[in-house]
């Protein structure tokens, strides 16, 4: 093989890997995070876990991606270690679908139906349709279908290019001697393991082996141990991803390694023991692409059948390898859902952000309610400390969520997920500001307590109405955020408008009492601070509700939306505002 042959082979490999990436990415985007959600919820039954692991891997075309995802699930506490074993075994079966697809390149025959099965017969049409979908349609779904079709075409062309480049190697004695060396099971395993560890894809390394089969120099006696080694080499990706993860996540990656290692040892021990007694005649035959797919599938299915009942043993072995440290402090689990391994599956990562943001929303509501109680009732130092602690915790939520979502924003997001991420980024900022205002209310209550100050009876009643209305608007904003209830979100802005009116009236009444000498200037400043904090809380609630309504419509101009809400006649805005004013009417002077 001359330098041009080497370049053609490398180019074919590059196209092969890139095509696999495009196709897998398109399939992942088509699933929209649904596969990951199913995997998360339906893995209690071992058989079901295997089937789901196989199905997910067959769709996303990567056992490494599935295993890394499982490591992330275990690390975040979504999945138990005992559930992970079945999914990992299923992933090994699912990855064999790629070798069956690639085996189509080896189909030969003059019959019209056989020729139609050859990729070279239908990939040109797939490429044409795929490019048309990508270039001339606006539908995101069709773009994803186009990516799948184009990716498959590039993958197959890369396979053909590799096969054509290595075909002349059949006449090179050195190449034949190297392959003969790999008939030694140990050397063959090492070769397959190293190749897969380097390119981090068993599907790709099996594809390379299938391409080499066109030389006619690859015998099954060499191909079999290479395939065994490829199954061990694919564990490297999961092992690397588990670095820095929780102990259970590292154990999940070890289960993957132990499964493939023990499966390989058992399979080869039984196979070569039988071969010593009753020699398998096919071992000296030239391997073909379909035969490689058969061996790959047979090994993974047999290993799963034998080791699935022993998954508990694999789990114990992983636990013995990585022991619990009783002295180690328990890790903060609040943000384990924000696992960076999920960034490779953007749709699922967005859902995890929504879950964590929902927790932040509940904490914000708790902080605001506690602060209002400090104003309505006797000052409680323990409750004040709780508000301060919640405010600090919510700040931490914003920092963690914001950092994670900025990283996620660089991923290949669908339009819907991009909108959701934008809504979440805006909303967590408002939740954080509400917690700041809750802390401000707490400080005002503390100041009054420390100085022995107290509002007049009428001022106290008015403030009670104000805090009640504020609690209501926070509750509505949080509920609409958690549930996505747009009707609930639409009820927030009329209440915010009513709260603005309450704020103005309370300030006017305070000025009147000040002029009559019924209130002191010092209390007036405190009331001014409290009113401002409560009114701004309602503003942030309004923002959160608007994000819920506007983002699904590909809009994010809160000011324009609010202006249209208040000026369009004939809608229910005025009626709801009127009802809220009646509900939260201030007591008569």
Which role fits each region the language model picked out?
Residues 69-91, 95, 99-121, 159, ...:
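Membrane-interfacial helix-loop connectors
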Residues 9-22, 53-57, 125-137, 150-162, ...:
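Hydrophobic core segments of alpha-helical transmembrane domains in multi-pass membrane transport
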Residues 24-28, 57-65, 166-167, 195-204, ...:
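Short helix-coil transition sites and intra-membrane helix breaks within transmembrane domains
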Residues 79, 105, 218, 244-250, ...:
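Cytosolic, long alpha-helical scaffolding segments
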Residues 43-69, 185-208:
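Hydrophobic alpha-helical transmembrane segments of multi-pass integral membrane proteins
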Residues 1-7, 109-121, 175-181, 221, ...:
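Interfacial loop-to-helix junctions that mark the boundaries of transmembrane helices
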Residues 59-66, 86-102, 119-125, 155, ...:
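Membrane-embedded alpha-helical segments of transport systems
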Residues 1-46, 145-194, 212-215:
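Helix-loop-helix hairpins and the membrane-proximal interhelical loops
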């Amino acid at each position: 093989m001359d330098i041009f042959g080497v370049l053609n082979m490398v180019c074919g490999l590059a196209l092969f890997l890139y095509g696999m990436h495009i196709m897998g990415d398109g399939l992942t985007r088509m699933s929209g995070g649904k596969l990951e959600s199913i995997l998360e919820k339906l893995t209690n039954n071992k058989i079901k876990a295997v089937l789901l692991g196989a199905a997910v891997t067959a769709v996303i075309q990567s056992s490494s991606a599935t295993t890394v995802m499982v490591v992330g699930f275990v690390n975040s506490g979504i999945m138990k270690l005992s559930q992970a074993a079945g999914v990992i075994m299923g992933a090994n079966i699912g990855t064999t679908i790629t070798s069956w697809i690639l085996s189509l390149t080896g189909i030969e025959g003059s019959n019209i139906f056989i020729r139609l099965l050859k990729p070279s017969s239908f990939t040109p049409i797939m490429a044409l349709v795929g490019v048309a979908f990508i270039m001339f349609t606006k539908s995101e779904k069709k773009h994803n279908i186009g990516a799948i079709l184009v990716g498959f075409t590039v993958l197959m062309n890369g396979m053909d290019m590799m096969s054509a480049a290595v075909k002349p190697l059949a006449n090179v004695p050195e190449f034949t001697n190297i392959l003969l060396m790999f008939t030694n099971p140990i050397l063959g395993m090492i070769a397959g393991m190293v190749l897969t560890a380097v390119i981090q894809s068993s599907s790709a390394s099996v594809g390379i082996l299938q391409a080499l089969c066109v030389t006619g120099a690859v015998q099954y006696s060499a191909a079999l141990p290479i395939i065994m080694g490829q199954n061990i080499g694919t564990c490297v990706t999961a092992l690397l991803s588990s670095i820095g993860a929780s102990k259970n996540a590292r154990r999940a990656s070890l289960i993957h390694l132990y499964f493939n290692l023990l499966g390989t040892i058992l399979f080869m021990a039984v196979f070569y023991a039988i071969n010593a007694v009753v020699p398998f005649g096919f071992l000296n035959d030239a391997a073909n692409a379909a035969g490689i797919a058969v061996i790959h599938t047979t090994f993974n299915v047999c290993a799963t059948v034998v080791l699935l009942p022993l998954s508990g043993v694999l789990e114990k072995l992983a636990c013995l390898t990585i022991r619990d440290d009783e002295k180690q402090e328990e890790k903060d689990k609040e943000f384990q859902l924000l696992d960076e391994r999920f960034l490779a599956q953007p749709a699922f990562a967005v859902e995890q952000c929504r879950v964590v943001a929902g927790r932040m929303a509940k904490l914000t509501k708790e902080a605001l309610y506690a602060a209002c109680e400090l104003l309505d009732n006797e000052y409680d130092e323990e409750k004040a400390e709780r508000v301060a602690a919640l405010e600090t915790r919510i700040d931490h939520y914003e920092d963690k969520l914001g950092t994670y979502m900025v990283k996620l924003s660089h991923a290949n997001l669908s339009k819907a997920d991009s909108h959701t991420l934008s809504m979440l980024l805006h909303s967590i900022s408002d939740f954080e500001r509400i917690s700041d205002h809750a802390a401000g209310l707490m400080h005002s209550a503390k100041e009054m307590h420390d100085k022995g100050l107290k509002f007049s009876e009428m001022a106290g009643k008015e403030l009670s109405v104000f805090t009640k209305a504020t609690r209501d608007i926070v509750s509505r904003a949080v509920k609409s955020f958690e549930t996505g209830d747009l009707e609930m979100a639409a009820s927030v802005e009329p209440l915010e408008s009513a709260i603005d009116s309450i704020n103005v009236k309370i300030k006017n009444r305070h000025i009147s009492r000040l002029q009559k000498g019924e209130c002191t200037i010092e209390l007036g400043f405190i009331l001014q601070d409290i009113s401002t904090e409560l009114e701004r809380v309602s503003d942030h609630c309004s923002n959160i509700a608007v994000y819920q309504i506007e983002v699904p419509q590909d809009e994010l101009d809160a000011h324009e939306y609010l202006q249209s809400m208040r000026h369009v006649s004939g809608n229910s805005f005025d009626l709801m505002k009127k009802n809220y004013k009646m509900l939260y009417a201030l007591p008569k002077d």
